[in-house]
Amino acid sequence: MAGPLIVLAGCEDGTYLVEVGASADEDQLAGRQPGAAVERERPLGLAPAWAAGRVLDVDARGSTVVLLLDRRPPLVVSHDGGVTWTERGAGLPPGRAVALGEHPDHVLYAARNRLHVSGDGGVFWRALAIELPEIHDVAWG
């Protein structure tokens, strides 16, 4: 394995970052030393309001992770593999968030019947002009 594989697990008491090791003995909650005791209250290191949100989708490339949450603002971004997080998406419209689309240079966000694209990790967003029927999922072609 080239680097740690990070899995985000939405659980009853929050969202957990889990590092998948080369073997079961090496699996751990992200940021923990191997063999350290696992504490139940290790949700992502996010503020309590963020941890209360349910993760709807994830876009992860290298050390950058974008989470789509079921709350406002709908996005949180980490550029250090989940150690620190920043709220993003304040300019996105209210309403039900649907999905994120992965791309090496852009983040795609879908809400109801409109797509929004960001080329800077979610700081600024541009709504695409076309209006679609209700969107259920997105992917780059």
Language-model features: locations:
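Extracellular glycan-interacting surfaces
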Residues: M1-G141
